[in-house]
Amino acid sequence: MINWKKGLASVAVVGLGFVLAACGGSNTEETATSSAAGAGDDATFTYAISGDPSSTNPINTSDRWGLTVTNMIYSPLVTVEADGTTQNALAESVEPAEDGLSLTVHLKQDVKWSDGEDFTADDVVFTYEQKVKKENGNADSLWVDDQPIAIEKVDKYTVKFVLPTPSAAAISNIATETYIIPEHIFKDVSDFSVSELPEKPVGTGPYQLKEYKRGEYFTFEANENYYGGKPSIQNVTLRIIESTDTAKVALQKGEVDAAVVLPSDIEDLDDTQISVYPYTENRIGYLGLNTHSDALQDVKVRQAVLFALNKDELNQAAYLDEDYYATPYSFLPPNNPYVTEDVEKYETNAEKAKELLQEAGVTDLSLNLAFNSTDPAQTIQATLIQQQLQQAGITVTLEGGDGTAIFTELKKPDSTKYNLFLGGYIMGNDPDLYGSLFETGGSANYFQSNSETIDNLFAQAAVELDTDKREALYDDLQQAIADEAIIYPIVDNKKILAVNNRIGNVEDAGLIPIYTFEDMSKLTIK
């Protein structure tokens, strides 16, 4: 096992449902049940997911369900463990150079694509050549010091990554979050920036895609050529059920085998039929402040908003029990190896909030707050935030809507439609991976942050190879981001997966951030 830290997607997410797309009604659900194999089939595992992926293109997908689908069809060079370490997948071994300027990867031999063709270094080179192109939409991790990482073919089963400058985070950035695609299938594709590739997927993962019906389901069948061994379960259905309440009912009725549930749902489940698996995703749920909005350009106003909030109330109301959440104060999750609590915590102080508003010369401050209206936790928190800010004399209008639409708007340069927004991210352990959230021009910088101090600290820490010096830089960075008051970390909430007891080896399949299962092929039907 290689003791690297996994850098997960720079995902703009909302609550428990990272993707909120198609809004199917009862007719849609009936169609899904009749057209796709359902739970109870002794050869099919059915998992309820909360929406369609924003992209099924493995080159640029970065949302929960897009990555879940990708992880079933394709394979990366290494895979992530629940504790953030990684082990080899398509890689046989990985050799970082002593000077930190290159990384040699020896590939597994005798791996076949699902169509029977050989997997080789040509496929790896082809994949990274597409991934590194910024126009394709997910290249941030493959650029160091504003220069792209290069990849070279050494021989049929060896590739070499060449860095423009040493980077402490290079291994995490190179080795993760990229799924290898077959050159012989996609070599004639001219545009990899699209959300759906024109060719039928051919992969090295445990399953092959049979059918995708938007808003209803994905169906998969076992990949007979899977290098990890033929999956125990022949068929998998991902059934799209947007409502968590509807998914819970489907689980109780045996219409699906697994679903994500809320803490408040657990007491409703029959533990003789259903088992519950809470596990950490190192996810930060937060309140974001849009610094481009006129009302929030003054840092004192932003700080006033944060002092008016009470995160203990927000978490108790939404998650009920500390068994299901931890309370963060940094932009890093509480168990991150670089996290420090030596930052401004913005302990609740309504009077301090009023003083800051007075110093800023602001009266009658009115803001709006965007949140995912289909997410129960966010709906609860949005209402409480409105009440808490009112106590400091700040009026808040709630703007509930579709999560994907909200973050599509926030991603627009200089967007000012929303002042405040609820969101979340899962990024991994190396703080450099968080740069896309906070650096000027970052691909997921929904806060519209434009701080020279923050940019410089990210840049310095990325190339600092001395562990103690790097840790000190990240301490300074956490304080700088807190001082800017662009993000109010609220919660590190656990994901709670409820599974019908007819499904076995759940923990052996690996419960991990974003993807749910590290390797779904290890699941069994009892």
Task: Annotate each PLM feature.
Residues 497-526:
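Long beta-strand-rich cores associated with HINT superfamily self-processing modules
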Residues 270, 292, 296-335, 380, ...:
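Periplasmic-binding protein-like
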Residues 223-267:
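Ligand-site clamp/hinge motif
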Residues 175-230, 235:
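Gly/Pro-rich hinge or "lid" segments in bacterial periplasmic/extracellular proteins
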Residues 397-400, 404-406, 435-501, 526:
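Extracytoplasmic/peripheral linker and loop segments enriched in polar/acidic and small residues
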Residues 323-359, 376-378:
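Structural transition elements
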Residues 48-96, 129, 202:
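N-terminal lobe/hinge region of extracytoplasmic solute-binding protein
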Residues 95, 99, 142-186:
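Surface-exposed binding/hinge segments that line
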